């Protein structure tokens, strides 16, 4: 049995893969694959409309928010966000992980040629991002602030800002990179001005990014490139140009699957259960260690851990691969191991990993 612990691209629901397989050569008796039908066709319009409606239902997205299905990875949003929202203002960033730093660095780069200021509220990089930044919102100039940017789940480092710990920002739009825990943790969308997420973790496959943006934040100036302008993309229903049709179709199937599982709250409870099995073992062991300083900040999507040495880490990864546990090696920047147990990851796989970890500890103490 193969278990895919990859951080993204990652495991997909078996039911979704079977549906794709079933429809691959003949989508809804059209005689064509979904990869072949026109994005301007009635059939595909129904696909994107249904996907949008199901995502709105799953996340209880208010009607004054637009849902965009965009090309490229979430990293493209590191540029699009300040270009659309920050001109003439101050853009604030709270940095608790590598991807948060990338977002800030991109804003700094853009601020050298565009009229806005990129400001860091602090970073935990010097502590290897082993805890979340304590965000001091008193440093935010509310009159001049375009937004405060956070990352809700740090995929590499294994930390999460859970809903109860979101910063209080008053009138300042809160922007979240939710790439690795969207639909895995239940957030109140109305607390955010903009949410974005690459699809290849909890939503589907690479090549698609979903943006959820409050209508009042849509750019009103004509100065932006059309492909980088949220307003134009929203006005055209995510089809200003040819969208990533297959990725949207597949995301739509994932949304249906999430609904069939009972919705986001139900899956979040299961995700807590899966993560707890691993964290309980780690906490009770003298052999394994979690690098995350505060237990309440531990991710339920990306469980990061180490053994007593780099040599044992390498042996663990090797033996795990032989056992059928794929892509469990930690990110190259931090080492160790990382078990990414997103929505589609089966609880049986976690139970098997726990057994393996216990046996590995016994054999290598």
UniProtKB/Swiss-Prot annotation:
Quaternary assembly: Homodimer.
UniProt remark on cofactor binding: Binds 1 pyridoxal phosphate per subunit.
Name of the featured protein: Phosphoserine aminotransferase
Species per Swiss-Prot/TrEMBL record: Lactococcus lactis subsp. cremoris (strain MG1363)
Catalytic activity: O-phospho-L-serine + 2-oxoglutarate = 3-phosphooxypyruvate + L-glutamate; 4-(phosphooxy)-L-threonine + 2-oxoglutarate = (R)-3-hydroxy-2-oxo-4-phosphooxybutanoate + L-glutamate
Spans traversing the lipid bilayer: none
Sites of N6-(pyridoxal phosphate)lysine modification: 201
Essential cofactor(s): pyridoxal 5'-phosphate
Location in or out of the cell: Cytoplasm
Organism lineage string: Bacteria, Bacillati, Bacillota, Bacilli, Lactobacillales
